[in-house]
Amino acid sequence: MHILVTGFAPFDNQNINPSWEAVTQLEDIIGTHTIDKLKLPTSFKKVDNIINKTLASNHYDVVLAIGQAGGRNAITPERVAINIDDARIPDNDDFQPIDQAIHLDGAPAYFSNLPVKAMTQSIINQGLPGALSNSAGTFVCNHTLYHLGYLQDKHYPHLRFGFIHVPYIPEQVIGKPDTPSMPLEKIVAGLTAAIEAISNDEDLHLALGTTE
């Protein structure tokens, strides 16, 4: 399959974003998949247009977006995105939407159509911390996953799409002893394992939910 893997620019006064750092280190061929890479702006208003133009000019079987989730201690494939922008902080264009629908004609939520449990289990099988997430937040990451679901629903019915959040890397948590992080090479290994699992046509039937 031809897979587009995206990462984000740094945001919130940081000078690095582990999502893009990890994406740049992925191999160009993973299993049977050909990998293209794209850096996305951490911008509510710009990210949709860049994705739209990229999909209009290239054929991809899969789009897999990667984002930073500071505070998480595992690599977390996302199950679902919701139709709301509700930003705790401004994006890189100083835009801070609050309680704003992403697409007025979109569904309340879009579920990733990738085998997210198989991807999660593949990460775990590498001896790495992996968990299935049921919330992509309400910042640009959720916005991006939702927009991909919207495009699949409205324009690209054969497109497969998903999102994975990754933790901080160690250099981002210097002086923050209680904040989890993960070495970049382990994030790259986890993403590689997840991408290899995308070949599964059907997801695994595993108890990877929560008790919350």
Curated annotation (Swiss-Prot):
Identification of the protein by name: Pyrrolidone-carboxylate peptidase
Lineage of the species this protein comes from: Bacteria, Bacillati, Bacillota, Bacilli, Bacillales
Keyword annotations: Cytoplasm, Hydrolase, Protease, Thiol protease
Enzyme Commission identifier(s): 3.4.19.3
Stored Pfam families: Peptidase_C15
Compartments where located: Cytoplasm
Enzymatic class: hydrolase
Protein family membership: Belongs to the peptidase C15 family.
